[in-house]
Structures are given as C-alpha cells and as structure tokens.
Amino acid sequence: MNLTSLPHTIHWHGLLQRGNWQNDGVPGVTQEAIKPGEDFTYHFIAAPSGTMWYHCHVNVNEHVAMRGMWGPFIVDPREPLPLEKTVTRDFILMLSDWDEKWADKPGYGGVPGDVFNYFTINGKAYPDTQPLRVKKGDVLRVRLIGAGELIHSVHIHGHVFKVAFKDGHALPAPYDADTIMVGPGERYD
C-alpha cells in the first residue's frame, strides 16, 4: 500500500524478470506508478543469487537521492562458493551522491562540471557515516553498490580488495585491487 502523498514503483537492479516484465517497476513502460492509497504486489523469483539493489523509479532524483527510497537486495546462493564460505563479516556499502538543486526536477541531474552537495555511504554523509568494525583475522565481504550518478573510488587504507563478484555474478578469476571504481548501478563484492 502506498501510504505516501506521491506515486511510486520499485525497480530491481540485477533481478531477472524473464516472462515477468510487468514487475520491473519502470513507470509508463512496465507498469503504471502506484498512486497514493493504491497497492501493488510485486511477484518475482529471487534469481540469480548475488548483490542487487532496488529503488523507486518515479522522479529518481528526488525519491532516491533526497528521500532515500532505495536499498540493498541480497539473494543468497543455494551453494556458496568456497571463497564465500570463508567470510566471517558481511558489510554493504551503498554509495550515493546528490545535489539539492536537482532534487525536485524530474529528468534533470548532474551535468559535466557540476559539483554535487553530498556524497553518502548508506545514506549518511561524513561525519555521520558508520565505521566498519572488525577484529584481526576476520574475513570481510564488502558489497559495494553504486546507487548514485557518479563514479565512486573506494580504497581501504592498508588493505587490498579481492574482487570476486561483479554485478551479482561470480568472476571466473577473482583479482586483487587497491581501489575499486564503482559506477552508477554497478555492484562489486
């Protein structure tokens, strides 16, 4: 049930909608926006496994960036890969950016040379971001999700990433990276 005063949909990044296009959440294309007071039930098979995310697809600038209408969507595999079985801590970092001057202007957004007001991790800008607290010996899975309009460079001082998944899919050969460049909609584990 849409209990807000604005229309909404949910669009799924990475979730396959084979034979189920009407649940993809693109207003005016796969469904009509859900008006205030109306309801819509999304039906889908949670496949493939991996790191995905969802967001409102109506006035994306305002609803995603300013109102935070997005989140991670994780589908666990039936049979984890050997590398996944070594993980002791799992962190999700949704990287976003926004500029208040574009918030209420559907179809507008960052233009070349534009400087955004805020850069966020899980919807929080520094100094309100949360630290990743770990213990010596922990094996971390860090799920990076590009939920903004810009490319975000991610680097953890004193450590190297082992990139094993891209856009929810296992890579044939994981690789080491000092810095990961996460673009809009991309996911890295």
Roles of regions detected by a PLM:
Residues 1-189:
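Copper-binding active sites and cupredoxin-like electron-transfer domains
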